[in-house]
Amino acid sequence: MNRKRLSDYGIRVGCMPTGPLDKITDVPGVTVGHATVRDARHHTGVTVIMPCEDNMFAKKLTAASFVLNGFGKTAGLVQVDELGMLETPIALTNTLNVGLVHDALVTVMAERCAADHVAMHSINPVVGECNDSQLNAIVDRPIHEAHVREAIAAACRDFDEGDIGAGAGTVCHGLKGGIGSASRQIEIAGKTYTLGVLVQSNHGCLEELTVCNRRLGEEIIAKRNARPAPEPNDRGSIMMVTATDLPVSDRQLRRIIKRCSVGLARCGSYFGHGSGDVMIGFTTVNRMPAGGMHRVVAQQVLTEHTLELAFRAIAEATQEAVLNSLCCADAVTAEDGRVFESISQYL
């Protein structure tokens, strides 16, 4: 697997400072794990974002979502939008495996709640997806509960990117896409906060691919000469997951994650008809206890004008995360013989 990230090519996105790993896991407590299925017919998997180590159902996280273009099948967003809370890990997989992964998260959380003596009669798993059928026999639905458990068990801070987990079969801007991540740190009132982004990139058309103002897609098309013309439409979807330790409300968090679209546009996406562009975000502070014993819960939130730095940071992190998903992915040959090249050979 190619481990070179965008920064390893001497390319820097923006000017804001990154976290130590420049990944979503720079937010304290957040870990990420993958399970991958790779054989002659399948390039697919599941990626799980673990927001914390403790029981999320017992102490829910403030969360929000925003759908830029709704050509997608993500599960769990209705309740996230209504209540502003997240109560399970976030899983990413392929489109037709959403149901099986959803069921696996229910089982995993039911076991956790039973072990912690926490009553659970209903739960809202969040599962995002991209259609990886260009490289994966998607109707086979090869991802099962064991893969979800494998991804959770593998969750760590310094996780792999590229064609792994939920990114094993994705195609981004006509090249091999995958999982990518980045982070930015901001200072407010003398305290440092982190915003991290993880993407599952499966969107865009080659012609529009832009790397820090360089029209790389057009260069690639020119170098290919007589090769077949690339797919002209921006379709296929991208999942964007934001984590932060900022003290914000779910409404403020929604304002922040909307700015992921800025980073996406900087890479050349115009959010086409067939692209499901979905953003999910959570903060690790302002937790909400489950049950009806607490009538009043005190929380701290930033003033609105303070969010300006967060808007800028999330745009930079998303842009870099998309480019890292491309840089870290190796070329893959589809079952029908089509080759989806790695961007690394053109940088």
Give short role names for the model-derived ranges:
Residues 1-347:
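Alpha/propeptide regions of enzymes that mature by internal proteolysis
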